[in-house]
Amino acid sequence: MKCSLRVWFLSVAFLLVFIMSLLFTYSHHSMATLPYLDSGALDGTHRVKLVPGYAGLQRLSKERLSGKSCACRRCMGDAGASDWFDSHFDGNISPVWTRENMDLPPDVQRWWMMLQPQFKSHNTNEVLEKLFQIVPGENPYRFRDPHQCRRCAVVGNSGNLRGSGYGQDVDGHNFIMRMNQAPTVGFEQDVGSRTTHHFMYPESAKNLPANVSFVLVPFKALDLLWIASALSTGQIRFTYAPVKSFLRVDKEKVQIYNPAFFKYIHDRWTEHHGRYPSTGMLVLFFALHVCDEVNVYGFGADSRGNWHHYWENNRYAGEFRKTGVHDADFEVHIIDMLAKASKIEVYGGN
């Protein structure tokens, strides 16, 4: 009996010691390792501090899911808006001929050399090597900022610009692209006064202000020799027609249109309608590949169905449709398709 009582007392004592030990350990652990239970840790600062990080992750996730490559409402190169456009568009082809893409594929070389055949052949690469000692030979559009929206106006030469009043709207774009003669003085209210890019070939070339990029559209190796000459010695004065022996343009802003891009338009877009695409189409697709948003002015006939230039008084000149080189009707069809695909907006003029 005495032994049983002794065992019972010892058991109770050990149990009480064990319980007290647990209580002490829990209390000490709570104070030492759970600071978020401290009243100071429950203020609004800590709760608010967590929210922006999570919200930021949500915004980043939405941006990634949207897949947009620019800050415009719609971005030109982003797929999904039109199956027709996506099946034709190739964003990997540079519209600018540079040191990096100087070597043309054989099929492109043959096609380009036959656009305006010359009696005397020239080594294209050697000509380009010399030319790129005078002009940059770089692609200024290689890097695009996804946080910006590059808006471009492609301004054609149609008579439908007369009386349109588009001038201020045109001048509001980042890039304003014109072609060939395209006078602005005296027509500012309708065509605008600013120009950032002017596309010409030797036979249509004119002097440009220092802040304008001259984009040469070459149809033959002689055109490359001409621009090198026009910016240096002035020796070349004739191709198949008289050309300017000297040209006043900013050498640092001279760009050369890529024949491979030229053929890409002919193959993919105009689908061999006409011998080759018109200058207007070349400029339009240049814009489609370097811009985020493209608005088109001065293309097609006027409201009476006449084809003429906006600076011509003869409304019935219709030179564009009489050349036999370009298929005007098919090019109008392509422009209409691009507009329906929401890739461009066309301003029909007067």
UniProtKB/Swiss-Prot annotation:
Keywords of the record: Disulfide bond, Glycoprotein, Glycosyltransferase, Golgi apparatus, Lipid metabolism, Membrane, Secreted, Signal-anchor, Transferase, Transmembrane, Transmembrane helix
Cysteine pairs bridged by disulfides in the record: 70-75, 72-149, 152-291
Source domain of life: Eukaryota
Cellular location(s): Golgi apparatus, Golgi stack membrane; Secreted
Residues modified by glycosylation: 211
ATP-binding found in the keyword field: no
Cytoplasmic side: 1-6
Protein's UniProt keywords contain Lipid metabolism: yes
GO biological process, one term: ganglioside biosynthetic process via lactosylceramide
Any one GO MF annotation of this record: beta-D-galactosyl-(1->3)-N-acetyl-beta-D-galactosaminide alpha-2,3- sialyltransferase
Positions bound to substrate: 116, 157, 180, 240, 276, 280, 300, 309, 326
Assembly with partners or alone: Homodimer; disulfide-linked. Homodimer formation occurs in the endoplasmic reticulum.
Similarity section: Belongs to the glycosyltransferase 29 family.
Function: A beta-galactoside alpha2-3 sialyltransferase primarily involved in terminal sialylation of ganglio and globo series glycolipids. Catalyzes the transfer of sialic acid (N-acetyl-neuraminic acid; Neu5Ac) from the nucleotide sugar donor CMP-Neu5Ac onto acceptor Galbeta-(1->3)-GalNAc-terminated glycoconjugates through an alpha2-3 linkage. Sialylates GM1/GM1a, GA1/asialo-GM1 and GD1b gangliosides to form GD1a, GM1b and GT1b, respectively.
Name assigned to this protein: CMP-N-acetylneuraminate-beta-galactosamide-alpha-2,3-sialyltransferase 2
Gene: ST3GAL2
